[in-house]
């Protein structure tokens, strides 16, 4: 369990804070952050980052989570009709509350987040005081560390840091923090608090999962485990309270992400397509995708994230040295190498072709792109800028 938590924390929590600090080197502008790799590659990478935390993965996942943690436990049964009906209602609400913004959403979000955190803390503390069981004696997977690292991908907290950095910076400016040093200091403090809180919650939930690990197999949905644990610890009332809070939290998250994604798409298309049209398309796609469930969306997202994360991580690291890097090849060569290796790895996992990719170092934990990217970085250092 320790290795799994370490791996998960590294990507889900640690990398999110580092990413936030990295994007501050570019005035919290994601387009400036990716610009060193060239105009077209930068546009593609930034587009994929925004799509992952928006319409492609996270927005549909909010709808699926709202059903699996909010409605399904209350209903007590599940079928295709119920999840379809809930997905339609969920994204209809998302559409109307995004196209016609309401203060109700802000009010719900303001009070709901503290309530949801409090509810999770109560569940975790109760689970620590009265554990439901002992962790399984042997791991059910081959690479516990690798699984933790890859699961950290799925939170996409790193991408969120890059995507919302500009919003956080604007908020600080509106509060009177006009000096860049002040802004960076406050961003670090707020990021540290947020990541620490996330870390404690993730750690607590991991522990709760470990206490029932002997009871469940790998085929059980993660959301179902949380629901079952909550019911065992706090009874039906606790399950219903968590369900309602989860549904509303997912709804406010969906509205915020849909709005931000719509504005981004309007900007990159230079307002050739209406905002409301993008919102409608996002909600329709979210409805269809949410029906496959959280686990299904996670499976779809895994290969996409496996390709998008490595180049993003390299740019995050190099961002701290941008003032000393005079040759863009130092950004481009390792980044393109990471994309290439990651793409081949994903292709191998899907088809069985190009098995040679498994010979590379760190393949067992899914990080065979690191050494080749480092070699590419070293080579780029010796190539003179024309």
Predicted ranges, named:
Residues 313-378:
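C-terminal membrane-solvent junction of multi-pass transporters and transport-like membrane proteins
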Residues 64-82, 173-174, 254-281:
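Helix-loop-helix connectors at the membrane interface of multi-pass transporters/channels
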Residues 39-53, 84-88, 143-151, 232-249, ...:
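Select transmembrane alpha-helical segments in multipass membrane proteins
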Residues 196-225:
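Extracellular/periplasmic helix-exit of transmembrane alpha-helices
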Residues 98-127, 301-313, 333-339:
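Membrane-interface loop-to-helix entry segments
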Residues 2-84, 88, 92-95, 99:
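Membrane helical hairpin/interfacial module
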Residues 51-55, 125-132, 141-205, 241-250, ...:
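Hydrophobic, membrane-embedded alpha-helices of multi-pass small-molecule transporters
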Residues 26-33, 90-112, 174-177, 287-299, ...:
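Membrane-water interface regions at transmembrane-helix termini and the short interhelical loops
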């Amino acid at each position: 369990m320790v290795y799994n938590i370490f791996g998960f924390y590294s990507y889900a929590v640690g990398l999110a804070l580092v990413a936030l600090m990295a994007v501050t080197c570019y005035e919290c502008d994601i387009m400036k952050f990716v610009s060193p790799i060239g105009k077209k590659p930068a546009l593609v990478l930034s587009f994929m980052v925004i799509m992952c935390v928006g319409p492609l993965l996270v927005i549909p996942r909010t709808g699926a989570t709202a059903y699996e943690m909010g409605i399904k436990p209350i209903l007590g049964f599940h079928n295709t009709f119920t999840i379809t009906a809930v997905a339609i209602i969920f994204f209809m609400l998302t559409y109307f509350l995004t196209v016609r913004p309401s203060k109700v959403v802000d009010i719900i979000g303001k009070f709901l987040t503290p309530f949801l955190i409090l509810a999770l803390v109560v569940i975790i503390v109760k689970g620590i005081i009265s554990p439901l069981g002992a962790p399984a004696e042997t791991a059910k997977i081959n690479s516990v560390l690798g699984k933790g690292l890859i699961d950290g991908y799925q939170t996409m907290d790193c991408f969120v840091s890059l995507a919302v950095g500009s919003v956080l910076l604007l908020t600080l400016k509106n509060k009177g923090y006009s000096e860049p040093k002040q802004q960076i200091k406050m961003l670090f403090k707020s990021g540290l608090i947020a990541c620490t809180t996330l870390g404690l919650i993730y750690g607590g939930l991991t522990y709760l999962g470990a206490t029932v690990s002997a009871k469940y197999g790998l085929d059980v949905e993660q959301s179902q485990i949380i629901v079952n644990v909550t019911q065992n610890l706090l009874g039906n009332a606790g399950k219903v309270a968590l369900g309602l809070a989860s549904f509303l939290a997912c709804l406010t998250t969906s509205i915020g992400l849909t709005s931000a994604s719509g504005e981004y798409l309007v900007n990159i298309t230079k307002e050739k397509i209406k905002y409301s049209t993008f919102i409608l398309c996002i909600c329709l796609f979210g409805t269809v995708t949410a029906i496959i469930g959280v686990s299904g969306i996670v499976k779809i997202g895994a290969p996409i994230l496996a390709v998008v994360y490595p180049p993003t991580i390299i740019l995050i690291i190099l961002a701290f040295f941008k003032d000393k890097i005079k040759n863009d090849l130092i950004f481009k060569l390792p980044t393109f190498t990471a994309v290439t290796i990651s793409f081949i790895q994903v292709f191998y996992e899907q088809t069985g072709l190009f098995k040679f990719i498994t010979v590379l170092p760190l393949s067992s934990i899914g990080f065979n792109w690191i050494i080749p990217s480092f070699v590419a970085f070293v080579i780029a250092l010796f190539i003179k800028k024309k």
